[in-house]
Regions:
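Glycine-rich cofactor-pocket loops
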Residues: 158-180, 285-301, 332-341, 365-380
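Active-site-adjacent "gating/activation" loops or surface patches in catalytic cores
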Residues: 223-247, 251
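Amphipathic, heptad-repeat alpha-helical segments used for oligomerization and assembly
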Residues: 240-261, 336, 340, 420-423
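Long, amphipathic alpha-helical stalk/connector segments used for oligomerization, subunit docking
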Residues: 309, 313-400, 404
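Short amphipathic alpha-helical segments with heptad-repeat character
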Residues: 135-143, 147-150, 154, 184-187, ...
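Glycine-rich anion/phosphate-binding loop at the beta-strand->alpha-helix junction
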Residues: 193, 246-332
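Generic, well-ordered alpha-helical scaffold segments in large soluble proteins
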Residues: 41-46, 98, 102, 137, ...
Length: 456
């Protein structure tokens, strides 16, 4: 293994430990492992088809041997495949030759060795392997890590549901909310995208060189190949069968999947920037870790580095995922090879996503609300009550309510409780309504924010 300090990519260097869970999935070893699984499961279903008499049904012993190779495929095995590829200059053919050699001592497989990779084009193996890799990454890494963020944010939304804060629209003071409600907004957005990721289909095909079962039909015209291949893709591999393809599976589902990940990333970039701003305003403080340095020259600094790191990595992820989404569904005629090298970078987009998730969660775990700063902002901005006052005036038929509050508050400095009190007392509205307005403060003017935050 290369020394991480000498790695070209930071994913395998500085950030290697943070993306360790992805390495067995998206590395070249991971691709080989998936190819072995596809090739051997294809051989198993050929042997189980009575009309393919040249491959008798495998015994339980042979099936167990096949499963053992699938489950124990190792780095040493991968190195042996690479050694074969040095001669073949073809990665999928190297897998086929390695399998023939590996099973030379298993009589039933050795007798049927020419049915390894039977009627397959390389892309039949590759497209299914890529689908398995993406599915594993979703189940083992992406969804659990996203669920962890959602769980953390949900807890924060509940905990901070009643902490009032001044909103800002266009960067200017606006109707109050609560910290918890603003976090709940993000939770809801992420929950929707989580469901989209869960529902994503992973498509596959094994229909030959141009998608028409040409070789299959010549060799065994009596086999219902479409049903056979559908069952293999859906039952043996747990994927979704694509019945209409060229040589390659068209990768539309990949574009959908990468775009779904990108939407999650975009939501987190948005929230990273908001939290960065709230820290700058003093609404949140950050827990200080002993020994850490915030600046090489300014000893006092406690910077929002986790949210900045998250934003940067998620931006990198979206750049890669965006290119994958745009490029992969495009292939000249029945295929060209431009997708092959691009597909080797799936793990890069997912890797930067995982880095962004991890940094965001680290940042969340350092946050502490600063009620004093929140309260001070609200108490200095009584003009926020212009909205409820003019709305109540509308209810009771007071003429030109909006315009009167605009004249009183817009662009004015030092709108005090006393100024608003005098204005309210001058209104010709029912005493009960007047009393409610006089009781109102910016910190109390939060509508259903607390309830909404606790309900998420």
């Amino acid at each position: 293994m290369i020394n991480p300090i000498a790695a070209l990519s930071p994913l395998d260097g500085r950030y290697a430990k943070s993306v360790e869970a992805l390495r067995p999935i998206f590395s070249e070893y991971g691709l080989m492992r998936a190819r072995v699984k596809v090739e051997l499961n294809w051989l198993k279903v050929l042997a189980a088809e009575p009309k393919i008499v040249e491959v008798p049904a495998f015994s339980d012993f042979t099936l167990a041997e096949i499963d053992k190779v699938i489950e124990t495929f190792s780095l040493e095995d991968a190195a042996a495949v690479k050694a074969i590829e040095a001669t073949t200059n073809h990665d999928v053919k190297a897998i086929e030759y390695w399998l023939k050699e590996r099973f030379s001592g298993v009589p039933e497989v050795a007798a049927a060795s020419e049915f390894i990779h039977f009627a397959c084009t390389s892309e039949d193996i590759n497209n299914l392997s890529h689908a398995l890799m993406l599915q594993e990454a979703r189940e083992a890494v992406l969804l659990p890590k996203l669920a962890e963020i959602i769980e953390k944010l949900t807890g924060m939304a509940h905990e901070l549901a009643a902490v009032p804060m001044m909103s800002r629209t266009h960067g200017q003071p606006a109707t109050p909310s609560t910290l918890g409600k603003e976090i709940a907004n993000v939770v809801y957005r992420l929950q929707r995208q989580f469901k989209n990721l869960q529902a994503q289909e992973f498509l596959g095909k094994i229909n030959g060189a141009v998608g028409n079962y040409n070789a299959h039909m010549v060799a065994y015209p009596d086999v219902d190949w479409e049903t056979h291949c559908r069952n293999f893709v859906e039952i043996s591999l747990g994927l979704t069968f694509n019945p209409y393809t060229i040589q390659i599976e068209p990768h539309d589902y990949m574009a959908e999947f990468f775009q779904a990940i990108s939407r999650v990333n975009t939501i987190l970039v948005d929230f990273n920037r908001d939290v960065w701003g709230y820290i700058s305003l003093g609404y949140f403080k950050q827990k200080v870790k002993a020994g850490e340095v915030g600046s090489s020259t300014m000893p006092h600094k406690v910077n929002p580095i986790d949210f900045e790191n998250s934003e940067g990595n998620l931006g990198m992820a979206n750049a890669v995922l965006g290119f994958l989404s745009e490029k992969l569904p495009i292939s000249r005629w029945q295929r060209d090879l431009t997708d092959s090298t691009v597909l080797r970078n799936m793990g890069v987009g997912v890797g930067y996503t995982v880095l962004g998730f991890a940094a965001h969660l680290r940042g969340l775990n350092k946050l502490e609300p600063n009620p004093a700063a929140l309260a001070a902002d609200l108490d200095a901005t009584w003009e926020l009550l212009a909205e409820p006052i003019q709305t109540v005036m509308r209810r009771y038929g007071v003429a030109n309510p909006y315009e009167k509050l605009k004249d009183l508050t817009r662009g004015k400095d030092g709108i005090t409780p006393e100024v608003l009190k005098l204005f309210i007392e001058s209104l010709e509205i029912p005493a009960e309504a007047k009393a409610k307005l006089l009781e109102l403060t910016p910190a109390l003017y939060v509508g259903k924010a607390e309830e909404l935050a606790k309900r998420i």
